[in-house]
Amino acid sequence: LSITLSIQAQKKKDKKEEPPKWDVANPGDDFNYKPHSFTTNEGTWMNLDVSPNGQTIAFDLLGDIYTMPITGGKAKAIRTGIPFEIQPRFSPNGTKISFTSDAGGGDNIWVMNVDGSDAKQITKEDFRLLNNAIWTPDGNYLIARKHFTSRRSVGAGEMWQYHITGGSGLQLTKRKNDQQDVNEPFISADGKYLYYSEDIYPGGYFQYNKDPNKQIYAIQRYSFEDGKTETITGGPGGAARPTVSPDGKMLAFVKRVRTKSVLYIHNLETGEEWPIYDSLNKDQQEAWAIFGVYPNFDWMPNNTELVFWSGGKILKININTLAITNIPF
């Protein structure tokens, strides 16, 4: 009897001594976390997305996620707190939003309802972390950039596909080395192609002091039908952050022109391309841009307007008239 009691006591003691599981969102009283309130009408490096019906914008600001009407106005916070959460993307039917979050201890892809409720972690990587997710047109899968490193910390990316129920994922692209990045995935509305940016600077490794007016990044297109990849655009000034219009005819992207980062349009039918806005914030082509060379932007459903972040503001541009509209928040 005394032996049985001793074993039971030891089990209770071991159970009591088990440390509590770490929760990024609730680190405990000793963290001395203090919330702060402020009002602003501008933000830094804001990723954004437009809902499929063109009525709502989702954007991130300082690691929190907000939504607001396409006309602007008071933004509604749908994800706040200690976790750093960015890169919201509406699902094709407009009922869900995917985003990158470190709430699970490292950057992974999560999905929530458009009001911020019922947030769920989709990917559960604890080493090869993920960001920049984009939905497939059927709404059943997410494709994201997975980060790989070796002896040098800069690392490189690969494109991986995950079902919205989770799982270990499916590799779509293979990194050519461990230092030149692949990033910024975007899927055509017909689901035939995956566009992404790739560091193709000569040398085969990450370098400082690269010349952005030569070519650092190019935009590649991966075919889901045959698995082949082709270069769509690049050249002097490079090309990054590919964003395809809903009708699949136009590709918006970022190019460096001398000292300016410029928003360009590429006609996917003719190959013609031209600049439409030359006052973007400086892109990160020369840097180690793990979250992308420029923040996410998006097309309006009408195929003639783009909504993007620049100079602290959310702007809308008509690609034909070049008329700019400020969307206040």
Give, region by region, the residue ranges found by the protein language model.
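Blade-terminus and WD-like Trp-Asp/Gly-His loop motifs, strongest in beta-propeller folds
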Residues: 49-55, 88-96, 133-141, 185-193, ...
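Beta-strand-rich domains and repeat architectures in extracellular enzymes and scaffolds
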Residues: 33-66
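Bacterial Sec-dependent N-terminal signal peptides
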Residues: 1-13
